[in-house]
Amino acid sequence: MSRIGKKPVPLPKGVTASISGQSIEVKGPKGTRSFSATDDVTLALDEGSVKVTPRGTSKRARQQWGMVRSQVENLVTGVTSGFKKELEISGVGYRAQMAGNVLKLSLGYSHDVNFEVPAGVTVTTPKQTEITVEGIDQQLVGQVAANIREWRRPEPYKGKGIRYKDEFIFRKEGKKK
């Protein structure tokens, strides 16, 4: 069993945390994030770090211990460096461009797809075939990237579609004559 919860979460310079009850608020150079922990764990500030300890020895308390510690670490990472997902578009005529707060995708449909970018996330298109999703909330960044990818997932024969930059597409062989 993992013992990741034992390790305290260090707070780098420029980051402050405040705990009230079961909720923690972390402020940093990129913004402010808060998280509400379950009743199975306790949160405590300890000399420039946040400690998470389980209440009791139940299985659920031990499970929540590591999970809450990872969530707090993600809060700290988000307000210091942020999170980033990069997507690539491959296919003839497939392209993306930003128009205000709307991402316009040309993906081979009879119409362009207009994707409304939610608050808390910034989407940029460095090239017509690249999309970058950035923000301080890891879950929201990943969800927005997944929603964009869902419009045209990569297909296994030619590899056309929207894929993550580091994603490997398993290619299939076509029919043989």
Swiss-Prot record:
- Keywords of this entry: Ribonucleoprotein, Ribosomal protein, RNA-binding, rRNA-binding
Please, which domain of life does this record's source organism belong to?
Answer: Bacteria
Q: Which Pfam families match?
A: Ribosomal_L6
One Gene Ontology cellular component annotation?
cytosolic large ribosomal subunit
Q: Name one GO molecular function term.
A: structural constituent of ribosome
Q: Name one GO biological process term.
A: cytoplasmic translation
Q: What does this protein do?
A: This protein binds to the 23S rRNA, and is important in its secondary structure. It is located near the subunit interface in the base of the L7/L12 stalk, and near the tRNA binding site of the peptidyltransferase center.
The record's family statement is: Belongs to the universal ribosomal protein uL6 family.
Q: How does it assemble?
A: Part of the 50S ribosomal subunit.
Q: What is this protein called?
A: Large ribosomal subunit protein uL6
| Organism listed in the record | Cereibacter sphaeroides (strain ATCC 17023 / DSM 158 / JCM 6121 / CCUG 31486 / LMG 2827 / NBRC 12203 / NCIMB 8253 / ATH 2.4.1.)
